[in-house]
Amino acid sequence: MFGGDNEDKIYPRMHLFYEEWTEEAADLYIKMDEEFFRLLNVLPVKKGFLPTALDYYESKDAKSLAAKLSAIQGFKGILSPMAETADGWIADYSSRYFTEDFPFGLRYIWQLAHDNHVLCPNIDMVYEWGINKINIYS
């Protein structure tokens, strides 16, 4: 949502986190999920105990996953981590989406992957981006 071409973008309005989920975001989610399952394959965990994101959300690809996430009733109305400024809306890197989910969530997956020599380029990219944003804006 806030990376890549959208880095430091000013938006005209607040976005809905799930209802405006994009195919691009879904594609990245799928790639990260595939990397997560490669990690699980080297850990001493029971195989098959956890469904893939595509299986869990009854989807077959990024397009169907984006459609599913944007239509889940329980996700309706959840706002994106954004802050209003005089010029418009910007990413709020002080939001718990960043200050909790990166250092206390994704970090452990990232660390386990590195400790077990599992290549996870998408997890690396997202984790490093988020941690850098927290460090810059905190």
Predicted features along the sequence, with ranges:
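C-terminal substrate-binding/catalytic lobe of Rossmann-fold NAD(P)-dependent dehydrogenases
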Residues: 1-107, 116
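Structural helix-adjacent loops and short alpha-helical linkers that scaffold large soluble proteins
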Residues: 117-122
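Small/polar glycine-rich anion-binding or flexible loop at a beta-alpha turn
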Residues: 123-133
